[in-house]
A protein has these predicted regions:
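Catalytic cores of nucleotide-sugar-dependent glycosyltransferases that transfer UDP/GDP/TDP-activated
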Residues: 1-175
Length: 175
């Protein structure tokens, strides 16, 4: 089975809690069990160690529809312990100095991320059978899939979705 594990944080690249531990270990365990698993997360450039930045592989860039405009998205990758990590880059959203979360525009940041995860599938060789979306930051991935990609064909054919909540206390409620 080919599984894309979408998370807002993953060890060894960025961590604020237990989600990063799971996102860093579960895909590795799935690969060890004979499955194909990759991780996709934001490219928090200020959270990376210099040696992690040096090992980043640029794949491409594209635009992501966000409301009434299109936003730049860079796509990078890196292999760690047999797992491919994909990184969604946009410095406006993810180059922050004071941690991963708690910004006035968190809702918009993860709207962008959720849509970018689906857009990136056009540009990578990995074609998931399942996307496992984790916590509120990735909650729109299955929604956007149903709205915009389900009938698009090609790399979007027959993708199943799993939504995992790691801490029900963090719901990403805005308004």
């Amino acid at each position: 089975m080919r599984i894309l594990y979408a998370a807002s944080e993953a060890r060894p690249f960025a961590a604020s809690g237990g989600l990063a531990d799971v996102a860093g270990s579960l895909p590795k365990a799935l690969c060890a069990a004979g499955q194909e698993a990759c991780v996709v997360m934001p490219y928090y450039v200020n959270s990376l160690k210099p040696e992690q930045k040096e090992k980043m592989n640029y794949i491409t860039n594209f635009t992501v529809p966000v409301g009434w405009r299109s936003q730049y998205c860079g796509l990078f990758s890196q292999q760690v312990d047999g797992v491919t990590y994909f990184f969604i880059d946009n410095e406006f959203y993810f180059k922050r100095d004071n941690g991963l979360y708690g910004y006035f525009d968190d809702a918009e940041r993860y709207v962008f991320f959720s849509r970018a995860v689906l857009e990136m599938l056009k540009y990578i060789q990995f074609k998931p059978q399942v996307i496992n979306s984790n916590d509120w930051q990735c909650a729109l991935i299955p929604v956007y899939y149903d709205l915009f990609y389900r009938n698009a064909g090609g790399c979007y054919d027959n993708i199943k979705h799993v939504f995992t909540i790691h801490n029900i206390g963090y719901q990403g409620q805005y308004g």
